[in-house]
Amino acid sequence: FLPFIAGMAAKFLPKIFCAISKKC
């Protein structure tokens, strides 16, 4: 369960950070 959460976070957090900071 935790590895799945970590995998999803690793996949989506960069996109969210990119959208917020406008640095892609």
Swiss-Prot record:
Tissue: Expressed by the skin glands.
Gene Ontology CC: one annotated term: extracellular region
Predominant subcellular localization, coarse grouping: secreted
Key words, A-Z: Amphibian defense peptide, Antibiotic, Antimicrobial, Disulfide bond, Secreted
Pfam families reported for this sequence: Antimicrobial_1
Any one of the GO BP annotations: defense response to bacterium
Known role: Antibacterial activity against Gram-positive bacterium S.aureus.
Compartments in which it is found: Secreted
Protein name: Brevinin-1Ba
Superkingdom classification of source: Eukaryota
Disulfide bridge positions per record: 18-24
Family, per entry: Belongs to the frog skin active peptide (FSAP) family. Brevinin subfamily.
